[in-house]
């Protein structure tokens, strides 16, 4: 793996999608080739799976096991079609959710057997693992407030995963805490209830040492200094 692989994680409304785009823009300003993907999704097959998982009118009876397998089917396609080739070219990959989401949501949230979850993830990703995972954390109250605000702007877009009860999301949050405790070198928890600028500054401090180890880009935006 010649490039750099960064993932964003967090419960709903944590701001990870916004921060992923801000980081992409900043890295591009420094001259790096950056690709941002979302999960589930990121490929034509993955986007079809995403619709089935989140927005389809026919997914109400979906079982936790089916959800687990579909998530990882999308992931397996993304890893092989997009992530591995881009990393081999030396590019920076930013992924809005990756396998930690499956551990947190399907493992802890849906209460599936964690060892089974890990084995299925292993099939999907193999040795393609992020170097840095940024876990954005907000309180349940802020998460709920942001979700309501987002749903108000998109009233006709149903998201099945956002319809779970509060106990489910509490289990997900606990799952993320367990993941961070298990892999503290990779997973960094950031308080994300502040301004997006302050959160981005904290993210940049973690990313900067990693990009310093990459080959220096040959071209940079005008007026942008090298790392």
What positions do the PLM features span?
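Conserved lysine of the Walker
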Residues: 16
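Hydrophobic anchor at the beta1->P-loop junction of P-loop NTPases
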Residues: 8
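NTP-dependent small-molecule kinase module
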Residues: 22-24, 141-227
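Walker A (P-loop) phosphate-binding loop of P-loop NTPases
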Residues: 13
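Conserved phosphate-donor/acceptor-positioning beta-strand/loop module used by diverse small-molecule
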Residues: 95-97, 126-149
């Amino acid at each position: 793996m010649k490039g750099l692989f960064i993932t964003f994680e967090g419960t709903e409304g944590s701001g990870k999608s916004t921060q992923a785009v801000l980081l992409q823009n900043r890295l591009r300003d420094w001259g790096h080739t950056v690709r941002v993907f979302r999960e589930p999704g990121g490929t034509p097959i993955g986007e079809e799976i995403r619709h089935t998982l989140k927005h389809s009118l026919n997914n109400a009876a979906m079982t936790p096991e089916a959800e687990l397998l579909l998530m990882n089917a999308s992931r397996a396609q993304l890893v092989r079609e997009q992530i591995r080739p881009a990393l081999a070219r030396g590019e920076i990959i930013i992924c809005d959710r990756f396998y930690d989401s499956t551990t947190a949501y399907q493992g802890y949230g849906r209460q599936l057997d964690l060892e089974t979850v890990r084995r299925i993830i292993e099939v999907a990703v193999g040795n393609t693992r992020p170097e840095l995972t940024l876990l954005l954390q907000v309180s349940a109250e802020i998460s709920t407030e942001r979700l309501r605000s987002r749903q108000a702007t998109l009233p006709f877009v149903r998201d099945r995963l956002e319809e779970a009860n509060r106990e489910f999301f509490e289990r997900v949050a606990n799952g993320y805490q367990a993941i961070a405790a298990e892999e503290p070198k990779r997973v960094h928890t950031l308080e994300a209830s502040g301004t997006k600028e302050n959160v981005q500054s904290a993210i940049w401090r973690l990313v900067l040492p990693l990009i310093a180890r990459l080959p220096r880009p040959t071209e940079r935006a005008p007026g942008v200094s090298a790392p």
